[in-house]
Amino acid sequence: MAKFIMVVGTSSNSGKTVLVSGICRMLSNKGYKVAPFKSQNMSLNSRVSIEDGEIAVAQYTQAMAARSEPSVHFNPILLKPKGNFVSQVIVHGIPYEDRDYNEYRSKKDDFLDKIKQSINYLDKNYDYVVIEGAGSCCEINLLKDDIANLRVAEIAGADAILVSDIDRGGVFASIYGTVQLLPENWRNLLKGFVINKFRGNIDVLKDGFEKIEELTKIPVIGTILYDETLILPEEDSQALEGKRVFGNVKSPIEVNIVKFSKIANFTDVDPLSSDCLMKYIDFNDDITGDILILPGTRCSTVEMDLMKKHGLDKKILEFVENGGIVLGICGGYQTLGKMLIDEDFSEGDIGTISGLGLFDMETTFGNEKAIKNSTGTISIFDQNFNVTGYELHEGHSVSNETPLISLSRGFGNCGDSYDGSFKIIGNSYIFGTYFHGILENFEFRNYLVNFVRHKKNLSKIENDNYAEIFNENMDKLSKLVEESLDLSKIIK
């Protein structure tokens, strides 16, 4: 039987996701078989599990931290917002149906049964299960229908830790208010408080620790210092609010990423950030980079319509005329074609719309969703690159261009043996693919960066290995968590 631990928060962005990752890596380093778990997550950022099912990217990342194969049981319910208060409901990795909040709530007991199935599976197959809550664990207007927080701890028999972000201010009031508003049976599950993102001398907090422990009879088990050197994947698009420039600010290579209105899987671009200056651009902005990335999106037709309305489509075509490099990923790839055909309005209110026309390609929506871990070979250069990625798309594309990838596993453009498209227009190279994670492939990423460096008469570089950087930072996070928290009463 597994030991269950739960991390809940006083608010969204309190540090639950990162703390779970750190605990998972810490336990893995001690030789335990560890699983992360989040009963219900709402996110447009998702990845593909070992079973070819869809789970939130946060639980995938936590699985990597735990050194465990990512499973649909790590995130049994995934909600992907579609707009107008409707979300696509993913159950155990498979699209279930679209529901608004009231429709979803009416089936709460059915979804809770699925959550219990996953808890039972994890209990039998792991030594430790580290559960992440959602948002605030005490939204009193939602408590009776909350299947993502302390109800889950109660079902699993988990000891719970309450984390709060001191960087926002009001940390002790947030902790005390949360505890007081919780029903007694859930309050009794709390075994300790964690203060997150503290800057300065911890001694100034001692009076606060003593008072909050006196009032609640629950100890503060640690304070995590704010560490700006940690490089960790972001969980969802909220992290992009106000984010404009990141990556290697001293790099002579600039990458522009179109900040789509319904951007998804934006972490696809992260592997470039160690060697390139990364900059998000809005629909009204000029393109100033050497490489332009059109990322994934929940609604390709909506993004295409917005690009036309704001004139970004013309700027992209001008960028190509001037020899720029373009990479479209999933929804971004679809916009590079001639037509996006959505006769059933499955993508939204736009329907059928013409694309950028850089590829001789048509994409049709309304088909069954492709959810695959995929592999293949890129053979368009003077050498072959073996690549891996994952597919999450409902549109099927028929392209008359040179395929980017010859598939050995996957769905690709339309269920044939190929994925993506490649085209040279003058001095411009245009790449398109359904492979999320394409830039995690070292050889392809290295070729792309050095191709730009060659065009700018710069010497070649060997990129950092993205997987190595991830593991180095997870080990650093694990050490920070272990040194900051007293988990002796929870981890036995």
Swiss-Prot record:
Domain GATase cobBQ-type: 252-444
Family: Belongs to the CobB/CobQ family. CobQ subfamily.
Pfam families from the UniProt entry: CbiA, GATase_3
Name of protein: Probable cobyric acid synthase
UniProt xrefs under SUPFAM superfamilies: Class I glutamine amidotransferase-like (SSF52317), P-loop containing nucleoside triphosphate hydrolases (SSF52540)
InterPro entries per UniProt: Class_I_gatase-like, CobQ/CobB/MinD/ParA_Nub-bd_dom, CobQ_GATase1, CobQ_N, CobQ_synth, GATase_3, P-loop_NTPase
Keyword Transmembrane helix: no
Keywords (A to Z) from UniProt: Cobalamin biosynthesis, Glutamine amidotransferase
